[in-house]
A protein has these predicted regions:
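Charged, amphipathic alpha-helical segments
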Residues: 2-16
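N-terminal acidic leader/helix
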Residues: 13-53
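Acidic, low-complexity intrinsically disordered segments
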Residues: 3-5, 49-99
Length: 99
């Protein structure tokens, strides 16, 4: 595995991310996306479905931008990523509704 954190510049022509709820594996990641017009977003323990048992960090950066439909995305910094089996982490419980 490559050393993290690392910053990537996703290809705007990359294949779009597609949700696959039948996927056996997911990638859990911490990242930051900087916008070309200023500002940024960060996420921790963000889950995306993957095909197979691995994903390259460069592809993960592209998947993040596509999944979140970020039109003004600039560099994506991946701080952590880990492939997990669906159901072996806290994604099987319904999210709490804020009151």
């Amino acid at each position: 595995m490559i050393g993290l954190p690392r910053t990537f510049h996703p290809d705007p022509e990359a294949a779009p991310y597609r949700i696959d709820q039948r996927s056996e594996y997911r990638v859990k990641s911490d990242f930051r996306v900087d916008f070309t017009n200023g500002g940024h977003i960060e996420a921790k323990d963000f889950l995306l479905d993957i095909e197979g048992t691995s994903v390259a960090p460069e592809r993960l950066a592209e998947m993040i931008v596509s999944a979140l439909n970020l039109l003004r995305a600039g560099p994506v910094t991946i701080f952590a990523m880990n492939v997990v089996r669906r159901g072996e982490h806290q994604d099987t419980e319904a999210a709490a509704i804020p009151r």
